[in-house]
């Protein structure tokens, strides 16, 4: 029991345990300034010449400024674990790529500046994790596409979205319509050509909308515009006012913009680009009575059309008006027609029935409508019984004969079939096409006049030889009834057909009708004994000239050898007697002395040729040397 009081006395003397020390901060990156003495922590690296995000960042930083550098890529690990970051600036770099999930750890981030970079698209995963983002600045990039789900994580918190100065032609308007807390929306200086009606109807807190310098020709009325007053000056606007800017667009001033003209604005410089009567005029100076539209007028429709069952049919309807009318089709049963498995409706007013059935016949109604009214036109379609299997793109009652090419038979199959039938049955029966003259390389083709066929545009001649399956086509004017074929191969058999190309008044389509076919053979080419070809002559001349040169060289060498032998093996002009002669004629001391006798020539064997020996005459007394 005495130990317990002793322990109680020693307990206050025990050293108190020290609290845990905070982790040492990371060193400040080179060329950066770090404010770590007071909260919040900041890392400032503007204009530091950085090529990438510094890896030694303090992960506790609340502000990171990396503007005016040369960063090209934002990687997943660059900003990892920076859960307390509130402000991130990457403005005016060379960023082309942002990795998916690069900002996924920045759940506290409120402002992200990516303006002045080289981004071309923004995908769904690149902004993932920014659940508290309020300011997103993407201006001055090269954005051409914005994914529909790119803003999903920040749709409920985003207050400021700047997409200006990009290359956007389309926007995910439904995704933008979900930004219920956005106050400022910058869409200026893009390539937007249209805005769907009701695109801003759910943006109840929108205070400024900038759509200047786009390609908008009209702005549809929106419930947002009717609820809030429109003022041009943002400074003097009340808190609930909406500032709308749409200058620099090619506005088409018609009745669709009357709602905008009725709003009092004084300091915007919008102008009309069309119609021509109002082009260039100040938008707010044009009276309301001049914003007019023209009702549609149907200018063209298909005539009554008759097609066999199973064939396609095209119904056409053209209309004009201001604004451009929209064309719709109604079936004989009163149903509105659109794109389906059996029909296709085109924006130009054409309705194409891919496969007609007997029940499709009746009166089709074309309806052209715009803001000023609508116009209708009726087009009758008759669907007859299906054609015989042999018919192919022809309204003639005579089916094509076996082996005769038509519009639906491939050329190779047609020629092969024709050749096979010809081998069995001989030449085909003439159907009006005559080959009146033919030689080795040419043939004159004639056919009867086809005036009974209305609307003939031209004739088509197609032929091929027995050694070639490729068809050759010739287009002949409708006024002609003959044609001279040239460049044919000699000694070959040709299959030839003539077709009339005309416009079928019943269908309004271009059709073909066979005029006739024929088979002929070109004459074999003769082999005349003419002059040799130029290449042969050239080779012969070269060989002859070379032979002459070689013979001349041989003769020259032979002459030199003969002269060498004649002079006893010495070059011409240098004989044995030449040495004494030269010594005699030499002058040493200015006086002439007696010349010694020349040495006797050495005996030599007799030669068959003449030997020339030169001797000098003896000097007389008068030639004695002179005294001193």
Curated annotation (Swiss-Prot):
The record's listing under Pfam families reads:
fn3, I-set, LRR_8
Locate the LRRNT domain: which residues? 19-59
Modification comment: N-glycosylated.
Q: The LRRCT domain covers which part of the protein?
A: 249-295
List GO terms (cellular component aspect). Answer: axon; cell surface; dendrite; postsynaptic membrane; presynaptic active zone membrane
Tell me where the LRR repeats sit in this chain.
60-83, 84-105, 108-129, 132-153, 157-178, 181-202, 205-226
Which GO terms fall under biological process for this protein? Answer: cell adhesion
Protein name from the UniProt record: Leucine-rich repeat and fibronectin type-III domain-containing protein 3
- Species annotation: Bos taurus (Bovine)
What gene makes this protein? LRFN3
